[in-house]
Amino acid sequence: MKLTKMDQRILNQIQHNSRISNQDLAQKIGLSASPCLRRVRQLEQEGYIDSYIARLNEQKLKLKLIALIQISMDRHTPERFENFEGIVKHYEEVLECFLITGQNADYLLKVIVPDMEYYQDFLLGKLTRIEGVTGVQSSFIMRKVIDKTALPLAHL
């Protein structure tokens, strides 16, 4: 499926407000309600719309410490990577995990926890106990400068 300009407008509206009603969406993009709903359903079926989620307030939930953690592994084998990834994907504190290159690390994790004491327990009780982890370097977020979830669509 090739995305049309109308599809791009739909995606742009939905990624900024996933709770928008079909009627409001249709009005904003200049389409009647039925064709708008058909297009949204098609975008969902084609996988362009992955999910609809609520973005929770970290501060209200007392999640005040965000860490970017570089992880070094002892061996660069598919089995070692599969083991690590299989374990960290179950840690609710891990928001994102990237296999990286160009650094002295193999993985970059984005982790959110309530405080430094919790972070220490997470680091020593979970991360460093994973087989193959040989190094951990943490950086802590002082302030979010840009915090958005909307993907750029202008290139389409």
Spell out what each predicted region is.
Residues M1-L156:
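A compositional/biophysical signature of low hydrophobicity enriched in polar/charged and small residues
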